[in-house]
Amino acid sequence: MNLCSSSGATASNTSLSSTGHPESNGSGPSEATHCFGGGGGGGGNNAGGGSGTDTAPNSNKGTLNGGGSGGGGGANPASSNGHSLTHNNENNGNMPPETRPKMVTVKHPESNKPKPTTKKIVKNIQADQDVIKALQRCRDEGIKRLDLSKSSITVLPNTVRECVHLTELYLYSNKIGQLPTEIGCLVNLRNLALNENSLTSLPESLKHCTQLKVLDLRHNKLAEIPSVIYRLRSLTTLYLRFNRITTVADDLRQLVNLTMLSLRENKIKELGSAIGALVNLTTLDVSHNHLEHLPEDIGNCVNLSALDLQHNELLDIPDSIGNLKSLVRLGLRYNRLNCVPVSLKNCKSMDEFNVEGNGITQLPDGMLASLSALTSITLSRNQFTSYPTGGPAQFTNVYSINLEHNRIDKIPYGIFSRAKGLTKLNMKENMLTALPLDVGTWVNMVELNLATNALQKLPDDIMNLQNLEILILSNNMLKKIPNTIGNLRKLRILDLEENRIEVLPHEIGLLHELQRLILQTNQITMLPRSVGHLSNLTHLSVSENNLQFLPEEIGSLESLENLYINQNPGLEKLPFELALCQNLKYLNIDKCPLGTIPPEIQAGGPSLVLQWLKMHSPYRQM
């Protein structure tokens, strides 16, 4: 018996939108993209800072939309041909009330109480009818692109076999547990999107789809790669992210046309030598698995430009990695590496080097200097005790360096002398006691994070960093801030939390672009009156200090939204001028002995406190 019978509809270049009106063919599926980077591991469909993503080409126009936007849930009692409960309901809307049938009820065995059929079931019945109609139109009009995504489909009707002209079929975000054998009749299919379903296997008949190029199986329940996939030798893009796959068979070597393979977020412990046969791969994502080693054969994938290995359990990287001279991005974040191979020097196209979250103590001599295309270097959360060897040459084209959470006790003098484009430096959580004497030459620095070190002094030369917008010095041992801080006219964020500062310089008032000033947990007894010039300040935190009073000029902070002055045991009153801060949304005055303001007013929040200050102010114009 031939399962692939067809009505013989003439092929058409027309595709239908969700409204059923003819449209010209769209441009086809969007190109697959792949990125990963620093910051977070993890997870979700995008890496930044460093987590990886894969984006499948989903149809969004020029298609016949079958099931609308979904809705419904649970099992659909209607069969795939639209019968069962449908005959009781489908024409009720056109019947007069007196002749209209009663609502269908379902009596459960465990209960004698009749229960009305839920709206979900009715919606699912309608969804099934819509899908059947969409398949019929697809057959009759020779439609090539069909979008049945988000249609609450649990069973794909076997009439799909009649849609022989289909080249693109989108079934993502449904509830499909198994595909019908008839899917193999779609011999012209090139793109098949099955992501976000409940598939545990694929039918062997899929092998007849010999023109299939893009197969998306993300977010299903596959415990292994279905064997039929290895017979789809025309595949160029294969997404298997977020399944339950534990092994990769040697048959993978048959997919020689693959350019993109995503196995991200599975349970794979070993990647066999078969990976080396995929010489056309440009993107390989095996992040978020349980790999401890990579095969030497990975070096045969010489066309790789993106290799994402982050969030595994890698103990080493094979020397053959140096063969990947087209490599631009290499994700090694959060593994168990103690070192990286010298051969990485050969990967001269890499523009980002990120080994965050490993146990690396040093890099091969001069490795970073050899990677002259690097623009971003992230070595955070390792065991470095000093800067990598290689001198100033290793940072020539770099704009961002992150060495957070290591054991580095100094920044070498002149190390950034050739880093003319360096704008971001993160040295948080190290063991720095001082900054190098040439800190004043870092004139292009925009963001400088020196938090959680042991700095005792900020050099006067800080005044030369006039492009600085973010300066974070929290949790150090600073006793004072130099007057030259006033030269940093572009500063937007100044964080001095948890130091030993007693007095702020008057020049702080020159920072007219300042938006956040964080001074909590110091020994400050008073704020300079010049603070009133900070017209763009939205956040001011002076909690846990020794404030005796707030200057009247605080009333000039028209942009202020958040004010933290809690836990100042000597602060007994607030200036009436504070009532002029009309944009104040949050005011924390806990554990301040404000005897002049009644407790019930204090408990009422910022607006009530401001109202009280205004009412009791000697300035009637307020």
From Swiss-Prot:
Identify the stretch(es) annotated as Disordered: 1-117
What would be one Gene Ontology cellular-component term for the protein? cytoplasm
Ranges annotated as biased composition (Polar residues)? 1-30, 85-94
State the UniProt keywords alphabetically: Leucine-rich repeat, Repeat
Q: Where is the composition biased (Gly residues)?
A: 36-52, 64-75
What the protein does comes down to:
Acts as a Ras effector and participates in MAPK pathway activation. Probably acts as a regulatory subunit of protein phosphatase that specifically dephosphorylates Raf kinase and stimulate Raf activity at specialized signaling complexes upon Ras activation.
PANTHER family in the record? PTHR48051, RAS SUPPRESSOR PROTEIN 1
- Its family? Belongs to the SHOC2 family.
Q: What is this protein called?
A: Leucine-rich repeat protein soc-2 homolog
The source organism is Drosophila grimshawi (Hawaiian fruit fly)
Provide the gene name from the record.
Sur-8
